[in-house]
Amino acid sequence: MYKYLPQSMYTMAAIKEASTVQENKSQAFVACPVTFVMEKVGGYWKPIILFNLLPGTKRYNELKRSIPTITEKVLIQQLKQLENDGLLIRKSKPVVPPYVTYELSKSGKALRPVLYAMAEWAVHNSGRQGKIFSKQMKDFPAE
């Protein structure tokens, strides 16, 4: 990439690039509210976690069982991000073994119609997969 630069310049270039990316990202949030929402709920696992919490409170192991392909590390990271973003509430009781539950916050529950609209869009715009999605919509929790 920087073939003729001294080694110290690689680090400076990486820092500059990272700060530019962060600045551009923050400008995108200001310019578009949808970008802000997608940053909070986007990605591969967050929508699945939110969907699984729509019916109500779940313990950590219940969540893990309902999303069998997610790793422990990723589930923990995603739960922390959702909690930090105010979309879910983590409650723990100081007992052995640990008793930890997760539930959607008021802000998280407000995403239900958004998630439903996204699921409906997928049914109508995903070709053959739409039939499978349509069957899954029957499991979509009511308000």
Labelled PLM ranges:
Residues 1-41:
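N-terminal leader segment of winged-helix/HTH proteins
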Residues 57, 64-97:
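Canonical helix-turn-helix DNA-binding module
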Residues 94-117:
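Basic, amphipathic "hinge/linker" alpha-helix immediately C-terminal to the N-terminal HTH DNA-binding motif
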Residues 28-74, 101, 132:
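N-terminal helix-turn-helix DNA-binding core of bacterial DNA-binding proteins
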Residues 91, 130-131:
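Short, hydrophobic secondary-structure boundary micro-motifs
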